Amino acid sequence: MPRAIKGVLIECDPSVKAIILKYDEESHDYIVEDLDDDRHLVIKESQLQNLKERLGRELDEKVMQPEESESE
């Protein structure tokens, strides 16, 4: 009998999609279906919040933050 997995359709930038694909290669926890080459994925509904938190942490580390003014 077929099993159904609840999924959520997400649209993201190609760079973010590449990060999600990398995560999924490690453990196959996130992606139900890769729909196209650019922006669309179906993500397991149960893993959506976990994925958002993990992406947030990684992007915070990689995005350059403007330095505070030294004149203050």
UniProtKB/Swiss-Prot annotation:
One cellular component term from this protein's GO annotations in UniProt: transcription factor TFIIH holo complex
Keyword RNA-binding included in the entry's annotation: no
UniProt cross-references to SUPFAM superfamilies, sorted A to Z: TFB5-like
UniProt cross-references to Gene3D superfamilies, sorted A to Z: TFB5-like
Pfam families registered for this protein in UniProt: Tfb5
Entry's Gene Ontology BP terms: nucleotide-excision repair, preincision complex assembly; transcription by RNA polymerase II; transcription initiation at RNA polymerase II promoter
Alphabetically ordered keywords of this record: DNA damage, DNA repair, Nucleus, Transcription, Transcription regulation
Location in or out of the cell: Nucleus
InterPro entries per record: TFB5-like_sf (IPR035935), TFIIH_TTDA/Tfb5 (IPR009400)
UniProt KW Cytoplasm keyword: no
Subunit structure: Component of the 7-subunit TFIIH core complex composed of XPB/ssl2, XPD/rad3, ssl1, tfb1, tfb2, tfb4 and tfb5, which is active in NER. The core complex associates with the 3-subunit CTD-kinase module TFIIK composed of ccl1, kin28 and tfb3 to form the 10-subunit holoenzyme (holo-TFIIH) active in transcription.
PANTHER family, alphabetized: GENERAL TRANSCRIPTION FACTOR IIH SUBUNIT 5
Family according to the record: Belongs to the TFB5 family.
Free-text function comment from the UniProt entry: Component of the general transcription and DNA repair factor IIH (TFIIH) core complex, which is involved in general and transcription-coupled nucleotide excision repair (NER) of damaged DNA and, when complexed to TFIIK, in RNA transcription by RNA polymerase II. In NER, TFIIH acts by opening DNA around the lesion to allow the excision of the damaged oligonucleotide and its replacement by a new DNA fragment. In transcription, TFIIH has an essential role in transcription initiation.
Entry protein name: General transcription and DNA repair factor IIH subunit tfb5
Lineage: Eukaryota, Fungi, Dikarya, Ascomycota, Pezizomycotina
Gene: tfb5
